[in-house]
Amino acid sequence: MMMILSFKERLKQFYSNFEFYLKPLFKILCTFIAFCVINHKIGYMTMLTQPTVVGVASIMCGVLPCSLIVVILSLIIVGHLYALNMELAIIALILFVLMYLLYFKFTPKDGFVLFMVPIAFALNIPYVVPILVGLALTPVSIVSVAFGVLVEKMMDYVSNNAVTINSVSSDSILKRMNILLNGMFTDKTFYITMIVFAVVIIVVYILRTRSVDHAWMVAIIVGAICNVAGFIGAEVVLSINTDIETSSLVIQTVIAALIAAVFNICVFSVDYSRTEHLQFEDDEYVYYVKAVPKINIAAPEVSVKRINTRRMKNVTKKKEPARPQAGKRKRVSRED
């Protein structure tokens, strides 16, 4: 525990010293991962999958705000879908425009959550998203997570049904779009995932805002239990085939809870053993306050002392007194 807190303080100090360089570097890394995930799943436009294009685009996104990065990633998805099927690209473009006009225009800071969901699914840790969102954000971010799940399921559907999508033949564009929409939105796993994630976010947010000891850890544990119970309940009680193995569900949820626990230690580390209950009042109210001190550990300072060996030899070496040479004596003259 103390080692983690000490590492946190060192990390904070390092970040404050090099924030100017680390912020764009973090954006470049996240954008590069997002590009790789998109190209791996729906890389139908060869030009956009070139390493040079991916690298240059990632570096450019390092100096752009998050809202513009989300727009660029959305256009990349639309470009890949256009190379596969024009109607599918139109559907994706309409969905993205609705997302921005209805939500991300007013809450641009939540835009990064939209593409964190597909990245988490690609890394096989999807259930860490609702727990971390419940810890760090508010229930309003449920909309961002829902859009992220929509983008993930859309790319997953296109990746698994590319041959079927190309074989769709109809005289009317609207009929072809209707066929594609029915194929995308008839997957019940999509709706179950959005509902379970929304419930987990609300539960985690409510519990971590309570004034009880270890509220964040309780929120993480209960949120993980709700996540497992939600997917298993949908499959057992509602008889909905979610195509999720119980073993992988439990393992991935445990990993998500561990990641959230580390996040808790790094962000919200308090000492409940020194909790104080205070009471004071003014002319209108009586206040009952629970004060929990934070755990602050100063990062150990490493001092390097340089020792000059030559100087040390000169200091330690003592000069020996000169001895009179043998056979020579001083003559002393005496005057009577």
Where are these regions (language model features)?
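Generic multipass alpha-helical transmembrane bundles of integral membrane proteins
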Residues: 120-121, 129-241, 253
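Alpha-helical transmembrane segments of multi-pass integral membrane proteins
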Residues: 11, 18-24, 33-40, 50, ...
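Membrane-interface helix-loop-helix junctions at boundaries between adjacent transmembrane segments
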Residues: 59, 72-146
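Hydrophobic transmembrane alpha-helices
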Residues: 20-74, 80-81
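Structural signature of hydrophobic alpha-helical transmembrane segments
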Residues: 38-52, 80-94, 187-195
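Short, highly charged, low-complexity non-transmembrane loops/tails of multi-pass membrane proteins
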Residues: 270-327
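Short, Lys/Arg-rich, polar N-terminal cytosolic tail immediately upstream
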Residues: 1-18
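C-terminal ends of transmembrane helices
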Residues: 12, 60, 98-106, 203-210
